[in-house]
Regions:
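Active-site-adjacent helix-turn-beta-strand microarchitecture at beta-sheet edges
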Residues: 105-190
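A short, polar/proline- and glycine-enriched secondary-structure boundary/capping micro-motif
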Residues: 83-88, 160-166, 219-225
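Conserved, well-ordered active-site substructure
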Residues: 110-128, 186-202, 207-237, 248-288
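Structural recognition of the beta-strand scaffold that forms the well-ordered cores
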Residues: 65, 97-101, 141-143, 150-152, ...
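Short, solvent-exposed aromatic-acidic interface loops
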Residues: 77-84, 156-160, 213-217
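Bacterial Sec-dependent N-terminal signal peptides
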Residues: 1-25
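Short glycine-rich loop/turn motifs
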Residues: 58-63, 138-139, 194-199, 280
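Zymogen propeptides
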Residues: 21-134, 140-141
Length: 288
């Protein structure tokens, strides 16, 4: 009898999870996003799920969709070896259409803790974990060649990133999905708990999504990496990679209100557009 009750409970629990996921996926797919044309081949999408109707929470999501042709809109990296700069100031300095915060960095001393190469020059190298192993955010790379952006997966070798042919490289992660296959995520609080998130996704048609999910506020809970993985798949991405998030999460678009800051950065602990954290590097979208 107890065995039957256990099996019934397990089936019911599994069914409820599947039902919730199905509801969430339908919610995302059927959402009427606020859409703004930013430039040729660049569109901005925004929506505030404010009825606790995505993952049973409020979620504020913003993303750019960019044609990855290397023609009218091109990708580039902005980076500093030591100095920390806000995402918006990186964008303004480099006369960009848009900017998205990049990889993980030393908040106290400045400089990325992950390998970065810009126009052939190495800006920062990897700081390995205490056990000498690569961090999860050093096991994939965003690379740019002739203005086109791609994601590459670490091959397991020690100096993998130094042998990549692209002149512009930013290690980042963890990788969430690669060519439609979900990557195995760890069980740390960074993965399991909800935080503001920054993410890059690639759709089957080659279009790129640069996405932010706001968090640490009653207006937007943030997401776990498992939730972020699902969101990117529901938005049609076959590959997606997590960037530095938390207080760093910022999407800036030239010409938009609030100084171009589209999302709600959290470093000031207020629900406004003023809470940018200074960062080490960014992904840039520029006119060719």
């Amino acid at each position: 009898m107890l065995k039957r009750i256990f099996i019934y409970t397990l089936i019911s629990f599994t069914s409820s999870i599947s039902f919730a996921q199905n509801i969430d996926s339908i919610t995302v797919v059927k959402t009427k996003w606020e859409r703004t044309r930013i430039a040729k081949q660049v569109k901005l999408y925004r929506h505030h799920f404010n009825q606790k109707n995505l993952f049973a929470a409020n979620e504020n999501i913003s993303f750019l969709e960019i044609k990855n042709t290397g023609r009218r809109a091109i990708f580039a990296l902005g980076a500093e070896e030591k100095e920390l700069i806000t995402t918006s100031n990186f964008g303004i300095r480099d006369t960009a259409i848009a900017a998205l915060n990049g990889n993980f960095f030393d908040v106290k001393n400045g400089g990325s803790v992950d390998f970065v190469r810009v126009n052939g020059k190495v800006i920062n190298t990897n700081r390995l974990d205490k056990n000498g192993e690569r961090a999860r955010h050093q096991q994939a790379a965003v690379v740019i060649d002739n203005g086109k952006i791609m994601v590459k997966k670490w091959d397991g070798s020690t100096d993998w990133e130094t042998k990549l042919s692209e002149q512009n490289i930013m290690l980042n992660g963890p990788l969430l999905t690669y060519n439609t296959n979900d990557e195995l995520l760890d069980t740390t609080s960074f993965t399991r708990l909800r935080h503001p998130r920054t993410c890059l996704g690639i759709k089957p048609n080659g279009k790129i999504l640069l996405l932010t999910v706001d968090g640490r506020n009653e207006n937007s809970a943030g997401m776990s990496l498992h939730e972020l993985t699902k969101l990117m798949k529901w938005l049609g991405c076959r590959t997606s990679i997590n960037f530095d998030g938390g207080g760093s999460t910022t999407l800036w678009v030239n010409g938009m209100p609030n100084g171009g800051v589209v999302n709600y950065p959290t470093d000031n602990k207020k629900w406004d557009h003023e809470g940018q954290r200074k960062v080490s590097n960014v992904i840039l979208v520029k006119k060719k």
